[in-house]
Swiss-Prot record:
It comes from the Bacteria. SUPFAM superfamilies: NagB/RpiA/CoA transferase-like. PANTHER family: METHYLTHIORIBOSE-1-PHOSPHATE ISOMERASE. InterPro entries: IF-2B-related, IF-M1Pi, IF_2B-like_C, Initiation_fac_2B_a/b/d, M1Pi_N, NagB/RpiA_transferase-like. This is Methylthioribose-1-phosphate isomerase. Its EC number is 5.3.1.23. GO terms for biological process: L-methionine salvage from methylthioadenosine. The active site is at 240 (proton donor).
Length: 354
């Protein structure tokens, strides 16, 4: 496979290294977060974004905080560890991968509680690195599982950015597209611009073009027309949280695309790692939806586009009911309706399908 060389998040002795996604596509800038507080700010300010990437980054931020903690006893380290985890948990509420990563690091800390402090610190760093590698492997498995579902030829629409930039590498929805192209399929990607943060226009187009994949950017309100004209044969998106019944929380505008796809008889696929599946949340109505600063809507590239004092709504995500979802692609396999049964069955399978 030709793998993307984009390094979204990396561990270094100096801290957690992130590509600043707020600067793309015109500038490729890397920032080093030297403290766990700086990592938390980077997540909140969307220097790093995408549910899997947020989870990996949070794990590394926790490891960084533990490594550098000025604690002389286990009790002191545990107290600091709790504060670090709380700080990470307050960054972004919708992406369940964030809380999955925090819980995993918490379990690891408790497993190590009888070890010397130096060992605890080293092992916590190792656990974060393991999460990073596991995410890449999961994305590649997702790509294999989803590539067979893509058309042998034609247009594939994607919304937001669910690629290497949203993960530790390779991508979820874009991983499926990458794997399909690498298998010889002749795919043309249509990337919704994805207002208001423009992840499709800025990020998806940037990374697909780096890989030489045929890509066309369209504005969000063009999707229906493209479908009606027969230019779209499939839709594949990522997810920030998937409920037990298959309802999908993803970037705002995903619900609209799903309804349009259903109307035009076009399959709508969701690609996400198992850490995005939240079997403890029964349906989409229970998923918290992050509300972001209205300035993201009122301003584009620093220029105000709306009248002063107009009211603004800026939910970062919407929920697509499972009835619009053709299949959910994970590293463990592909789930189809009824999702409450198929997702439970996948929960019992191996972590990564062969």
């Amino acid at each position: 496979m030709t793998k993307s060389v984009i390094k979204t998040v990396e561990w270094s002795d100096e801290g957690v290294v992130l590509v600043d996604q707020t600067k793309l596509p015109t500038e490729e800038v890397y920032v080093t977060c030297g403290t766990y507080e700086e990592v938390a700010v980077a997540i909140k300010d969307m220097i790093v974004r995408g549910a899997p990437a947020i989870g990996v980054t949070a794990a590394m931020g926790i490891a960084l905080g533990v490594r550098d903690a000025k604690a002389s006893t286990l009790s002191e380290l545990r107290q600091m560890f709790g504060m670090i985890c709380r700080t990470m948990g307050e960054t972004r509420p919708t992406a369940v991968n964030l809380f999955w990563a925090i819980r995993r690091m918490q379990r690891k800390f408790e497993e190590l509680s009888n070890m010397p402090l130096a060992v605890i610190k080293a092992e916590m760093v190792f656990e974060a690195k393991r999460i990073h590698l596991e995410d890449i492997a999961a994305n590649q498995a997702m790509g294999r599982n989803g590539a067979v579902l893509m058309p042998s030829e034609g247009g594939v629409l994607t919304h937001c950015n669910a690629g290497a930039l949203a993960t530790a590498g390779y991508g979820t929805a874009l991983g499926v597209i990458r794997a399909a192209v690498e298998s010889g399929k002749n795919i043309r990607v249509f990337a919704d611009e994805t207002r208001p943060f423009l992840q499709g226009a800025r990020l998806t187009a940037w990374e697909l073009m780096k890989d030489g994949i045929d890509t066309t950017v369209i504005s969000d309100n063009m999707a229906g027309a493209m479908m009606a004209q027969g230019k779209i044969q499939a839709v594949v998106v990522g997810a920030d949280r998937i409920a037990a019944n298959g309802d999908v929380a993803n970037k705002i505008g995903t619900y609209t695309v799903a309804v349009l796809a259903k109307e035009h008889g076009i399959p709508f696929y969701v690609a996400a790692p198992w850490s995005t599946i939240d079997l403890d949340t029964p349906d989409g109505s229970k998923i918290p939806i992050e509300q972001r600063n209205g300035r993201e809507v009122t301003h584009i590239a620093g220029k105000q586009m709306t009248p002063d004092n107009v009211r603004i709504e800026n939910p970062a995500f919407d929920v697509t009911p499972s009835k619009y979802v053709t299949a959910i692609i994970t590293e463990r396999g592909v789930a189809k309706a009824p999702y409450d049964e198929s997702l439970r069955k996948l929960a019992e399978t191996e972590t990564v399908s062969a």
